[in-house]
Swiss-Prot record:
HAMAP family in alphabetical order: Ribosomal_bL17
Disulfide bridge positions per record: none
Protein name according to UniProt: Large ribosomal subunit protein bL17
Biased composition (Basic and acidic residues): 171-181
Listed InterPro entries: Ribosomal_bL17, Ribosomal_bL17_CS, Ribosomal_bL17_sf
Family membership noted in the UniProt record: Belongs to the bacterial ribosomal protein bL17 family.
Gene Ontology annotations of biological process type: translation
GO CC, one annotated term: cytosolic large ribosomal subunit
Length: 181
């Protein structure tokens, strides 16, 4: 019976599961973002957040505890010097899981687990207002009549404005070609 044993077993023995999580948390803290299955990402999240909390403590005992779980000394140093200070004012929730879809080979649900960046905010999308189609034929005729009576810009009038815009903007393809030469 598995009473009072929290956590998913993931079809592995205890030693294999612990070794897998040690490898995953080391890789996660090194790269700050990894792709894995949903179940592994959910299990990794709690361990990674505990490691970051240890990093926020910053004392020698916390460093030794983190080093006993994380396999690489450079990653432990990175945790205590760069990652943990980023979240000094945050009380938890250092990671986010983004679902990607399914893996083609075995239909396993994939996710990306990454560290939350406080400074980066998603840009707000501009809403485009589309022209509504006229509901009746009478409205369509009225709309076409107003369009015909409006002054029409000639090609010569629009050309200087387009040239002014093009002169200030660099084509990214030109930069790539220059680098290739």
């Amino acid at each position: 019976m598995r009473h009072n044993n929290a956590g998913k077993r993931l079809g592995r023995t205890t030693s294999h599961r612990i070794a897998m999580y040690r490898n995953m948390v080391t890789s996660f803290l090194n790269h700050e973002r990894i792709t894995t299955t949903d179940a592994k990402a959910k299990g990794l999240r709690s361990i990674a957040e505990k490691m970051i909390t240890l990093g926020k403590k910053g004392d020698l005992n916390a460093m030794r505890q983190a080093a006993s779980f994380i396999r690489d000394k450079k990653v432990v140093t990175k945790l205590f010097t760069t990652i943990a200070p980023r979240y000094a004012e945050r009380a938890g929730g250092y990671t986010r899981i983004i679902k990607l879809g399914i893996r083609p080979g075995d239909n396993a649900p994939l996710s990306v687990i990454e560290l939350v960046e406080e400074t980066i905010q998603a840009p707000k999308a501009k809403k485009k207002i589309a022209a509504k189609k006229p509901a009746t034929k009478v409205a369509a005729k009225a709309a076409s009549a107003t369009a015909e009576s409006a002054p029409v810009a000639t090609a010569n009038d629009a050309a200087p404005a387009e040239e002014a815009e093009v002169q200030g903007v660099k084509d990214p393809a030109e930069d790539c070609e220059a680098k290739a030469d």
